[in-house]
Each structure stands twice: as structure tokens, then as C-alpha cells.
């Protein structure tokens, strides 16, 4: 009996390992078993020191000690409004919450468990913005802007019969941090809104194949160097029920960005960026007259300027505000005065401030999120506004996101790191203590998946380059492994992050395990969160430094004894598709296989706002556009390349894929392509599983010994 027990003990680890499940590579991204369990609808209750989240199907409310002090009966709420799924709950006032459905805003008092009032909306209402002080919703429909109240669901704020006049929507194709087009004033007495005239913007035809015959849908698309939209800012007075406009001369079609209200509702601040994007002015305007008051801040840079964050006013000094700028090379904070137009630098970090979270009750300290010394991480800091002293509040390595309480006493710290799943702590800023509220279990513990490692390489000038590699769980350094290099490499993205699994797609973890692959990713110069000098090397020539750094990564791979240098493949999407194509053609023979999704092929076909920032116009920079023209290099193709594109992509237009196809014909080269007829720039829904299958199948079929076809 003892011998049997001993034998079982010896075999137990093997049995446990054998019990681990494999995950289908193409389904890994969408397998809920692999998702980390989170605290859903986590938020502070305004004006209190209590917070809430979904627990056991209901909303639970907690005090700072972590004790449950109340909640919302979701079954009762759902019954009241005939809800078919868990609603997103937003607290607005005391015990009142807002429940949003496709055609209503409901205000519900959870203490007495009954509805207070409701606002009906048309089915086509979009861009909806609720204001509790006015018990009203501003929304857009058919390019026009309306106001809905209990009594009146469709009061016109800005309505035009001209379909080229669009009100209440984000402008400038969501560049400059613009995510919305409706801005309630602090007390709810006014609504500011963006309006754009796209009359002179070129039409681009997209085809809907779901009709018989197929029908044409034109979109407005301002290609680099062509006519741009003309924007302006409107102001609606709720009491007078009248709309007026700021007096901005915008005949030069410059960009209107980062709109903000002053606390007294008398001024609006607006960052106005030249079309050339090498200069901007932060101007204040009088709300009543629409006249410009003064310029509060100016910034110029021969490469580009890119304001992305609106002014944030101090709670105790309504004339002062925080402005974020990278004029010194890194995104830092500046304290500005809206009356005197004076400013001073508040922080001088040699790292990137990513977000202003809020202030303490006295307005003496501002809380921020930023990379800190390691750009792969994100930490929370407090900055004393008068003294400039800085205190780092989070200490665990990894990525921290914070939800600050209204009084600035506490924040909910949402954290993960490479080997640490999602967890939430309550941080008491005053006491400098942290209490763990929730730790998610490792959702991958029972599955056979690859493991992620973080790496540091050096560019040709000594600049650190951060990378990551996924290896099979049974990695054997004596074996030879094929490699998939996954790239993005462009502005406003970072792929190598010290958060759970290195922010790696689950299908790549499954690929490493199931197919005995290595998956390698490197953030080259040009990617974000490293400061302006690191990012701006791409100016006027997007591919040069990106390719240099990616080839540094390739040389590193080739130096590893366990890498099969004859079986390197590369994959990227959007800018990553451009970089994938550039590397495949301009470094022929390096990769046997390439997969380029939603790829930019010719930058003169790309949108003006983004393209002109980094490349100037085709007229100003003909050499740069020619050097970065992917079709120019297709004659060098060795191996196999697959292009994937959404047929109704409104961002990287289908014209790019057609251009590379024609170039292949002209050069007598064979490329592979796949269109998703009903998808836009990113393939979504059930078809994304098909996308992963397409990628993996092409990779496995073609990433063999290099050929010279």
C-alpha cells in the first residue's frame, strides 16, 4: 500500500500537468474562460466616501473600511424598466442613479425603489449627453443637434437642411484627443458644441454589398493635402433657448481642439492648431458675445505640436487651470492663469504624465497618472501645486489605474503586472495606506499557454528599446523555434507594457503553446510614452527608424541559439501593416511570411489630420511620401505576403489594398489578399475568430525555409 501511495505521489505532478487544457488558437481571444474576472461598474458615489460595484448580480455599496453599507436590487430595477441585461449604473445625486437604454434615460431612486422621472429619446439618437441639473439630454440625429427633456423630446439646438453641416459630433476625425462634440457647462446652463462644414471635403465611395444591386455610400474623407473640414463652436443657452457661435475666423480650416468651460460658465477655452500643425494658441472666448478675450498659451515646434488634453480648472482658484504640454520634451503640467495669461511649469519630469486624475478637497494637490522612470509601467503621484513637491503613491511594479474620490482622500487602485492578474486596492492618501479589496484568480492557471518575458535591447544610438517574447510553457533552449514578429510601431500606441501577460493577445499565447512558436514584439522609436524626441524621429519619414529598430530586434533573434533564423514571419495591423509591408519589401529575405492587416500603402491616401502631422503635405514633402510608398518596393518581394482589409474601412481606405494589388500585377509578383465585405478598419464580432484562423493558417502554411520566389 505504501509503494502505491508513493507511486501516486510521484505521478501527481504529471497528472496535474496533463489535466491542463489546450486552447484553440483561433478562439483564444474570445474564450471567456481566459478572461480575468473584474469588478464590474466600479465607481465612486459622487459627494461621498462610498464606492460601488456589481456583486452577486446586484450593486453593492461599500465604505472606506470595506464594509458593505447598502446596494441596489438589480432584479427590482430590471423589472421596473423591463431591462434585458445588466445595466451600467451611474450615480448622479444622493440615492438617484441614471439607467440608460437605447430609447430612454431613466432616473431611479434605489432607496425607495421607484422611478423618479424619465426622458424619452428617438431610436436614432446618438452622442447622448445627460445633465442632471437640467434633467435633460443633448443628442444628435441625422447630423443635427437636439435637446430632450421630460416634456419635450426633440427641441432643435442646431439644425440644418444642408447634409454637409454636422453639429454635436466629434470633429477632425477624432484627432487631438477629441472624443465628443457636446459639452455641458459646469452648472448646466449652457451647451457648447462642435459644428463642422464638410462641403469641400472630398467624397470617397464605399460599397454596401448587402443590397441588390449593391449600393454606394459616400463618406467625407480629407486626404493629405486636400480640402479640410471647417469647424466652429456653438453655444446654446437653455434659459433663452437660443444658439450663438464663437467669433472664430476659420477660413484657413485650422483645427479647434480641447474645448473647456471656465467654472463660472462665462468663458470657453479652445486650443487652435494651425493646419500645418507646427503651432497652436490656447485662446479664451467670452461666452455671451463670442468674442476672443486673449491668448493664454502659445506653442510652436518645427516638427509638430499636438494638444490632446483640455484645461482643468483648480477647485479653489477658479481663474487658475492645469495645462498639459510636452514643450520641454516630455508631457508635463503647467499652472496657468486665465485672467493674467501668466503660467509656470509645475512638473519637470523626464517621463510622461498621462492623465490628471483630480484634486484634493482644498485644491492644494493634484493627482496624476504617469509612466514614472520605467515607460512600461504606470503609477499614481501627487503634486503639490504651490511647492511643486512630488510624491509617488503606488509602489507595486506594473500598471496602475486610479479612480479618485470626489474629496481626493481616497483612490481605487486598479493594478496588474506581468505575472499578476487584475486586483483592486483602496488607497487612503491621507494615511498613506492601502487595503486590498479584490484579487482575481489567474484565469490561465488550468490552461496550457505560452509565457511572456520582458526584454530590453538597444538601438544603434544606444537608446533602450523595450521588447517582449512569448515562449511555449515547455520551452527547450536546445530546440529551434520559428518566430512570429508582431509589430505596430507608430504614434499613440505601445505594445510592451508591464501589465497582466504583457498586454499580449491570448491567441498569441495559444500559438506559442500549440504550434511551438516564439512571438516577439518590440516598441521602436516612434511609439508612445517615451517622450517627444523618441517619438518624433519619424517626422517626414515614417519607416526609416521604425525599420532600423525592428531590424535590431531581428538581429537579436538571429543571435539566439534556439531561434530558427530561416523561419521568421511578421504580422501587423494599420500602421503595423505599413511597417510589415515595408520590412518585407525593403529587407527582402529576412521574413518568409508576412501578414499585413488594414495596411497604409500610400500616405497621400491617408487622412490629413494624422498624415500631415507626421509627414507634412505631399507638396511639402514629396521625397518623404515617395520614400514611404510601399508599392515602390514590391519588386523586391521574396516569400509570401497576405493582405487583409475591411471592404468598408473608413480609416485606411480600400484604395490602399487595391494599390498594392495593382503594383503586384505591374511587377509580376504574386501576393495574397482577403477582404471582409462587411467590416471596417478592425474586424469585429464573430468574424474576428475567422480572422485569427486566416492569420494562423497562412502563417503555418508559409513560414518554412526562405524562398526566392
Model-derived features with residue positions:
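Bacterial Sec-dependent N-terminal signal peptides
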Residues: 1-23, 708-709
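Disordered, low-complexity tails and leader-like regions
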Residues: 1-3, 60, 489
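Residue-level detector of secondary-structure boundary/capping sites
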Residues: 3, 136, 179-182, 224, ...
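Serine-hydrolase catalytic core recognition
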Residues: 203, 265, 401-709
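Beta-propeller folds
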Residues: 16-392, 397-401, 409-410, 420, ...
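Hydrophobic alpha-helical segments, especially transmembrane helices
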Residues: 3-4, 52, 682
Amino acid at each position: 500500500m505504501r509503494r502505491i501511495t508513493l507511486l501516486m505521489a510521484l505521478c501527481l505532478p504529471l497528472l496535474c500537468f496533463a489535466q491542463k487544457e489546450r486552447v484553440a488558437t483561433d478562439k483564444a481571444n474570445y474564450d471567456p474562460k481566459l478572461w480575468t474576472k473584474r469588478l464590474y461598474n466600479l465607481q465612486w458615489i459622487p459627494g461621498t466616501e462610498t464606492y460601488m460595484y456589481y456583486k452577486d448580480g446586484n450593486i453593492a455599496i461599500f465604505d472606506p473600511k470595506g464594509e458593505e453599507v447598502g446596494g441596489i436590487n438589480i432584479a427590482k430595477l430590471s423589472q421596473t424598466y423591463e431591462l434585458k441585461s445588466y445595466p451600467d449604473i451611474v450615480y448622479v445625486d444622493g440615492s438617484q442613479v441614471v439607467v440608460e437604454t437605447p430609447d430612454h434615460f431613466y432616473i431611479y431612486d434605489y432607496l425607495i425603489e421607484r422611478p423618479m422621472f424619465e426622458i424619452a429619446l428617438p431610436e436614432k439618437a446618438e452622442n447622448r449627453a445627460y445633465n442632471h441639473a437640467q434633467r435633460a439630454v443633448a443628442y444628435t440625429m441625422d447630423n443635427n443637434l437636439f435637446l430632450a427633456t421630460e416634456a419635450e423630446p426633440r427641441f432643435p439646438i442646431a439644425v440644418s437642411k444642408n447634409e454637409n453641416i454636422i453639429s454635436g459630433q466629434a470633429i477632425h476625425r477624432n484627432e487631438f484627443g477629441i472624443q465628443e462634440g457636446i459639452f455641458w457647462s459646469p452648472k448646466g446652463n449652457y451647451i457648447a458644441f462642435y459644428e463642422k462644414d464638410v462641403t469641400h471635403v472630398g467624397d470617397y465611395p464605399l460599397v454596401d454589398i448587402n443590397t441588390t444591386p449593391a449600393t454606394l455610400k459616400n463618406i467625407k474623407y480629407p486626404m493629405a493635402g486636400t480640402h479640410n473640414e471647417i469647424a466652429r463652436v456653438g453655444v446654446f443657452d437653455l434659459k433663452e433657448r437660443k444658439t450663438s457661435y464663437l467669433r472664430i475666423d476659420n477660413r484657413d480650416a485650422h483645427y479647434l481642439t480641447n474645448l473647456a468651460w471656465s467654472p463660472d460658465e462665462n468663458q470657453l477655452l479652445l486650443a487652435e492648431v494651425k493646419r500645418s500643425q507646427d503651432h497652436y494658441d490656447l485662446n479664451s472666448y467670452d461666452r455671451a458675445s463670442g468674442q476672443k478675450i486673449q491668448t493664454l498659451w502659445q506653442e510652436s515646434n518645427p516638427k509638430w505640436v499636438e494638444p490632446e488634453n483640455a484645461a482643468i480648472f483648480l477647485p479653489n482658484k477658479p481663474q487658475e487651470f492645469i495645462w498639459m504640454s510636452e514643450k520641454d520634451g516630455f508631457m508635463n503640467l503647467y499652472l496657468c492663469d486665465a485672467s493674467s495669461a501668466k503660467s509656470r511649469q509645475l512638473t519637470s519630469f523626464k517621463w510622461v504624465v498621462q492623465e490628471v486624475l483630480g484634486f484634493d478637497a482644498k485644491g492644494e494637490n493634484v493627482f496624476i497618472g504617469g509612466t514614472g522612470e520605467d515607460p512600461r509601467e504606470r503609477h499614481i503621484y501627487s503634486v503639490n501645486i504651490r511647492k511643486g513637491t512630488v510624491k509617488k503613491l503606488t509602489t507595486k511594479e506594473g500598471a496602475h489605474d486610479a479612480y479618485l474620490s470626489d474629496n481626493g482622500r481616497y483612490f481605487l487602485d486598479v493594478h496588474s503586472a506581468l505575472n499578476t492578474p487584475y486586483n483592486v486596492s483602496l488607497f487612503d492618501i491621507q494615511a498613506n495606506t492601502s487595503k486590498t479589496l479584490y484579487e482575481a484568480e489567474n484565469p490561465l492557471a488550468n490552461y496550457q499557454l505560452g509565457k511572456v518575458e520582458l526584454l530590453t535591447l538597444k538601438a544603434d544610438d544606444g537608446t533602450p528599446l523595450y521588447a517582449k517574447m512569448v515562449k511555449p510553457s515547455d520551452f527547450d533552449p536546445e530546440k529551434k523555434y520559428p518566430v512570429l514578429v508582431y509589430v505596430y510601431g507608430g504614434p499613440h500606441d505601445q505594445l510592451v507594457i508591464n501589465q497582466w501577460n504583457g498586454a499580449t493577445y491570448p491567441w498569441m499565447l495559444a500559438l506559442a503553446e500549440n504550434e511551438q512558436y516564439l512571438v516577439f514584439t518590440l516598441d521602436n522609436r516612434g511609439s508612445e510614452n517615451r517622450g517627444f524626441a523618441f517619438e518624433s524621429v519619424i517626422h517626414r519619414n515614417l519607416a526609416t527608424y521604425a525599420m532600423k529598430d525592428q531590424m535590431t530586434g531581428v538581429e537579436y533573434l538571429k543571435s539566439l541559439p534556439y531561434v530558427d533564423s530561416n523561419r521568421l514571419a511578421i504580422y501587423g495591423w494599420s500602421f503595423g501593416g505599413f511597417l510589415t509591408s515595408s520590412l518585407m519589401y525593403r529587407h527582402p529575405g529576412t521574413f518568409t511570411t508576412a501578414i499585413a492587416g488594414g495596411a497604409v500603402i500610400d500616405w497621400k491616401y491617408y487622412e490629413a489630420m494624422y498624415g500631415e502631422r507626421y509627414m507634412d503635405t505631399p507638396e511639402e514633402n514629396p521625397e518623404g511620401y515617395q520614400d514611404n510608398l510601399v508599392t515602390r518596393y514590391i519588386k523586391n518581394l521574396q516569400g509570401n505576403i497576405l493582405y487583409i482589409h475591411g471592404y468598408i474601412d473608413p480609416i485606411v481606405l480600400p484604395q490602399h489594398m487595391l494599390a498594392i494589388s495593382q503594383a503586384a500585377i505591374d511587377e509580376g509578383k504574386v501576393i495574397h489578399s482577403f477582404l471582409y465585405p462587411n467590416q471596417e478598419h478592425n474586424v469585429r464580432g464573430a468574424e474576428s475568430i475567422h480572422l485569427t484562423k486566416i492569420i494562423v493558417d497562412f502563417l503555418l502554411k508559409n513560414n518554412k525555409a526562405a524562398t526566392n520566389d
